[in-house]
A protein has these predicted regions:
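Domain-level signal for soluble alpha/beta catalytic cores
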Residues: 1-564
């Protein structure tokens, strides 16, 4: 029985094909090949009109030594095809492309594989070019076609927008679930010469955002050559728990006499990629723009004898924004959450929200960043206003202008989902509890799992807020069992709040509450060392005079940090 693609990856480095577009255009397609002037340039139509061309290209790459070829579907999602007036043909064209590649792969002895190519499209979700729902359905349709046509893996490639990566991976998983066919899911970002994706994300931010999404490969392709990718491959090698792929261009392109020229000949390209594979522990290599069957033929003997890499990556558990990642455990502690972007806690924020002064709201967030906050708590709940709409509009402005990761603060499931659709990075959702049982907590956890978010959980159950050490630890245990054991979240993605009560109420029942909270912090850290904790420290002094509040807050913060 032929081994699976995953089995091959466990044995040795896997070799993919090279560029498809240049090979197609070298054949000189005409209007007749496309069918009409309006369809000119829609190369995915050649999967139907010029099947022999596409299969010949696949065959040449297999003969050059490739283990797998990518389907001719880079631009075959409905959003792209709509620009040619044929969005309804997406499924058909993806099935056709996958079947063409499948036929060629199966004609070779031994294991040869088909990788379903899913390109970035022409619209950036982060910049509001389309909606989350439209992009999700577009990718779901494309992946469904690739699966139906026999693809062995799905490759979401040449990614330029972190938000696009997240929606595409979720759509791919949905398509697999509907088809009852799970295949490896690969993601490749395109890091420009600026050192980031087109919208500004570095590769580490991408890693932290996709880490909870259950992909199998995270790598790089396009834009630059092997040399320019080195530092980004190093970052992945150090931290990524996923297999690493590298499909560079044949060097940095340059313009010579009006033509795009790639400087690396097959031998030079092969030497550089082989060096990168050995140095960074690459699992998959191949080529992108400017590479040909000759480049793959030159690369094959260098990498096909390389055993599957064995790395020991160390991933620092983090939240992330569009631009950067922030460790959940800061050194020195604590991690500071800015709360002035909260309509319940800031009059200035609430007043600006009432006026729909979005620029002022963004400036408040920028102020929190300047003052040293590590995360932003965002809450737009305001009586009489549409919270879903406000969250949508605010995050549309905020995510491109502020670097801090977001803590989404809402009790409403639709608001949380909209926020997770708008925020490109790895967010934290604030919060769940068991006040009304587990039903609502489970709905929120379902969203966090689907969108790759961490979760704040309060020590509140059906009996109310936990005031004693015993009750706090008891509810914490219940939270760990639900979030970590049942839902499968990494322990660090659970952030438990053992609750802080005011000492200014005069209520005898709360006299020892601060000590109980501190002891709960210590107990949680000791019993579940990877689980994180959080406190609303200033709650301890609520109702006291300003001078007293500062002193008590500082004292509580000091002891909270000492207790874990």
């Amino acid at each position: 029985m032929t081994q699976t693609l995953t089995q091959l990856m466990n044995e040795r480095v896997v070799l993919l094909d090279g560029g498809m577009g240049t090979q197609i255009f070298a054949k000189g397609p005409t209007l007749e090949d496309y069918g009409s002037k309006e369809l000119e340039g829609c190369v995915v139509l050649l999967n139907l009109s010029r099947k022999a061309w596409i299969q010949e290209i696949h065959e040449r790459y297999f003969k050059a030594g490739a283990d797998a070829v990518e389907t001719n579907t880079f631009g075959a999602n409905p959003l792209v095809l709509a620009e040619f007036g044929i969005p309804e043909r997406a499924f058909e064209l993806n099935v056709a492309a996958a079947k063409l590649a499948r036929e060629v792969a199966d004609s070779f002895e031994g294991g040869r594989y088909v990788i379903g190519s899913v390109g970035p499209g022409t619209k950036l979700l982060t910049l509001g070019h389309t909606t989350y729902a439209a992009m999700f359905e577009s990718y779901r349709t494309q992946v469904a076609g690739l699966l139906a046509g026999g693809a062995d893996a799905i490759l979401i490639e040449t990614c330029q927008d972190l938000a696009q990566i997240k929606v595409a991976t979720r759509a791919a998983r949905e398509a697999m679930a509907q088809a009852k066919r799970k295949v490896p899911l690969w993601v490749q970002g395109t890091v420009e010469t600026t050192g980031t994706l087109l919208v500004g994300s570095d590769i580490t931010s991408v890693l932290h955002a996709v880490e909870p999404l259950g992909i199998d490969v995270l790598g790089l392709n396009c834009a630059t050559g092997p040399d320019e990718m080195a530092s980004h491959l190093h970052a992945l090698a150090e931290a990524s728990p996923f297999a690493i792929s590298c499909l560079p261009n044949a060097g940095l392109p340059r313009n010579e006499g009006g033509k795009v020229v790639y400087p690396l000949d097959p031998e030079a390209f092969a030497a550089k990629v082989a060096h990168a594979a050995a140095q960074h522990g690459l699992a998959i290599v191949g080529g992108c723009c400017g590479t040909t069957p000759d480049h793959i033929r030159a690369l094959a003997p260098h990498v096909k004898n390389l055993a599957a890499p064995h790395r020991s990556p160390k991933l620092e558990r983090s939240a992330s924004s569009l631009y950067l990642s922030t460790a959940l455990r800061q050194e020195p502690a604590p991690t500071i959450v800015g709360e002035r972007t909260n309509a319940n806690g800031s009059k200035a924020f609430r007043d600006a929200l009432a006026k729909e002064d979005w620029d002022a709201l963004v400036e408040i967030a920028k102020g929190q960043q300047k003052e040293g906050a590590h995360l932003l708590d965002v809450c737009v709940a305001y009586v009489g206003r549409d919270e879903v709409r406000d969250m949508d509009l605010y995050l549309s402005k905020l995510v491109t202008q502020v670097q801090l990761p977001l803590m989404i603060d809402s009790t409403e499931v639709p608001v949380i989902e909209r926020a997770l659709q708008k925020a490109p990075g790895k967010c934290i959702v604030n919060s769940i509890n068991f006040e009304d049982g587990e039903a609502k907590a489970r709905k929120i956890l379902d969203l966090c799992k689907a969108y790759g978010a961490s979760i704040v959980a309060l020590t509140i159950d059906e009996q109310g807020m936990a005031k004693t050490l015993e009750r706090k630890v008891q509810i914490a245990e219940r939270l760990v069992k639900l979030v970590v054991d049942e839902y499968g979240f990494h322990p660090s993605d659970l952030i438990i709040d053992p609750l802080t009560f005011t000492l200014g109420s005069g209520d005898e029942a709360f006299r020892g509450s601060a000590v109980a909270t501190l002891e709960a912090l210590k107990a949680i850290r000791h019993r579940w060392p990877l689980v994180n904790t959080i406190l609303g420290v200033s709650n301890v002094s609520f109702g006291l005079a300003p001078g007293s509040r500062h002193i008590l807050n500082a004292l509580m913060l000091y002891h909270a940090v000492q207790h874990g």
